[in-house]
Structure formats: structure tokens, C-alpha cells
């Protein structure tokens, strides 16, 4: 975890102090459950719940000998207690404490992620509504296609982000599960009721079945969902980067007073935040492979997953949280240039209206093949003009004039019918209906 890419609230969940505090929370829940079952007296339960404490430095000192951080933790806590310490960590195994504590930490962390996703969705929705009718050129393969609106672009992003909210709700069900089932998961030394009570105290569900650990397909699902979320965020960031290119310049990241873009070129205003998001998304996705490989543990458990999770889980949550907040800020403060969008629309010389013309000809009796051939032939002439450097002066009249001078078209379409094809409103007439689908 790098401080540079971490928000305080999420970072606070993934440090040694919080980890052992959560271990202690789980252990106290187990003690309370034993007490509820009549196995630990009220006085001992009360003493443990009130007095149990730990010291990080002492845990580290003990671990030098034990080579086992959970035993170092339980030993340290026992030192803070009296005779009642014999009931601390009673009848359970290390993974009962560790995995159940991890469920608590992941649940809290995922709630922060869900909050970030909701914020991003709302920001995209608001900016989409703001630019519902802002005309721009749509691009496929990076090449001009047909007129669209910038609002449609943002609405598409918003709808995709909303899907992640549904996926994360399901993932929350998978990860908010505890297990207090003993060394082999067979409840030999602790009844099922102990697990149900302890997990209930902690606000967790119980796994239907476990061995020594909670099964890692749950963790892998989480990693994959965060990777998918990152890919969607990267898609947004990459599109912003393209739209900010000097020759496009339809949007721009906010550039604050005193900000610098280059140590060598004073004129530079770069999409550095979107580039940063792109890089963070690569980091997030990089954890999917080791988390998937953690699913296949030996028999009732081996420890190969542990080192992976010590790296992956904190970084997955912290980086995803930061990515969301940064992207939300980029969208919220994004500067949009509608005039440049209109200028770029005109740069096609009117080619963006080619399909409209194509679809009018068959209505007049011409075959689709002949229609396509005539329209494409005229379009290729415009490309030849544009190849000669006429982009800077291009407007809709280039293609329109070519069509108006084509004797073959005149047999099927009169001048007013041809001119009617060059109408931006034709391409935006359903935007309102689309928005109603997306946003209700």
C-alpha cells in the first residue's frame, strides 16, 4: 500500500492495530457464545470482555519465538488477564479467528467501495443529464461514425457502473460469512450453536460448511468483481484521455491555478488523473490470478493463501477505493467544450450522414446494393478531399454538394429530400427515451 494512493477511512481498516482489534472482537464474541451456552461463568466472561487487551510491540516480541502471529496475539492477551485467560481462544483454531475477523474487515471495506460506486454513479448521472443534448460525433474504431450526444456517452458509463452495484451486493453476501468450526471444520470441540451465536454477535452469517478455513472462492469472487469494476473505470478514463487529445479537445480534466504539466514544456495540460486511474486499474487486476489460485488449497487447508492475502486484500480495497474517489472527482470537475464537439462533427464534411442517405434510397425503389454503391462512391470522393488537408475547413456541405450533383440520386431524391438527410435532430430524437430507460 502506498500512502499516495490511499484514502484515510479505508487505510484505517488495513493496519496491524485494526487487525488485532478485530481478532479481539471475534475472540470476545466466542467467549460470550460459550457463556450463553453455559460453558463459561458470567464472572469469567465479564472479566475477559472488560480486561482483554494487547500491545503490538509485545505481539512482535512473542512472535520472534512462536513464529506464529495468532499464537503471539493470544499469548499477549492472556498476559492481560488472570485465571480466566484459560477460556480465551477456547475450543477454536487460528483460522476461526482470522477468517471470521477477515470477514468483518472485508464487509466494512466493501461497504466503503459500494459507497464509492454509488457516488460515481450519481456523478455520472448528473453530468449525463447536464449534457443530454450536447451534440458530438460518435466514433467506432476511432473513426467518425454518426452524431450522438455527450450525455449518451455518460449515460452508458453510468448504466455500467450501476451493474457493478448489483454485483457487489451479491459479493457482499458471499464474503460476510464467519466460521467457528474448529481445526478440521467438524465442530468436534465446539458445537454448531457456538458458531451461530458468535457470528450472530458479530453481525455475520455462518458458512453452511467449512474445513479449517472459509473457502477461498468467496475471496476470489471479490477480487474478480473489483477487477471488473476497475476495467469499467479504466474504460471511462481511457475515453477521457482520448477526448482530451489536442486534435480532439472535446473535454479536459480540470487544471488548477499553479498546476504544472511538464518540467520542460510550460504549455502542457495533461490528463494525468485519468492516466493515473488507468495505471491503478492494472494494479487491481493483477491480483485476480493469485486470488484465483488461492482457491485450490490442499485437503482441509494449507497456508499458501496467507501470504497472497496479506498483500492482495489490503491493496485491492485501498486501491479500488482510491480509484473510485479519483474518477468521481475527474467526472465531477470535467470541463466540456460543446463548440469543439460541433467543430469536430463538421470535420467529416458531412460523411456522418451517409447512412441516412443510404436508407432513403431503397424507400424510392433502388436496391440496397445500388444504394450503398452510389453513397459510398460519393463518400470516397470526400475522403480524397479530406486527405489533402481539408479537414480544418470541412463542413457538412462537402458531402451534401457531392450528392446534390449526382445525377443518379436525382432520379430518386429531390434536393429537399437530400438536404433533409443532413439533420442532427434525426440522430437525437430518441435520447430522451434512452435516458428514461437508463435513469427511470
Swiss-Prot record:
Keywords: Lyase, Purine biosynthesis
Catalysis performed (reactions): N(6)-(1,2-dicarboxyethyl)-AMP = fumarate + AMP; (2S)-2-[5-amino-1-(5-phospho-beta-D-ribosyl)imidazole-4-carboxamido]succinate = 5-amino-1-(5-phospho-beta-D-ribosyl)imidazole-4-carboxamide + fumarate
InterPro entries (alphabetical): AdenyloSucc_lyase_C (IPR019468), Fumarase/histidase_N (IPR024083), Fumarate_lyase_CS (IPR020557), Fumarate_lyase_fam (IPR000362), Fumarate_lyase_N (IPR022761), L-Aspartase-like (IPR008948), Pur_lyase (IPR004769)
Pathway the protein takes part in: Purine metabolism; AMP biosynthesis via de novo pathway; AMP from IMP: step 2/2; Purine metabolism; IMP biosynthesis via de novo pathway; 5-amino-1-(5-phospho-D-ribosyl)imidazole-4-carboxamide from 5-amino-1-(5-phospho-D-ribosyl)imidazole-4-carboxylate: step 2/2
Keyword Acetylation annotated: no
UniProt KW Disulfide bond keyword: no
PROSITE patterns: FUMARATE_LYASES
Residues annotated as binding N(6)-(1,2-dicarboxyethyl)-AMP: 4-5, 67-69, 93-94, 212, 263, 268-270, 276, 307-311
UniProt family annotation: Belongs to the lyase 1 family. Adenylosuccinate lyase subfamily.
UniProt name for this protein: Adenylosuccinate lyase
Species in which this protein is naturally found: Helicobacter pylori (strain J99 / ATCC 700824) (Campylobacter pylori J99)
Lineage: Bacteria, Pseudomonadati, Campylobacterota, Epsilonproteobacteria, Campylobacterales
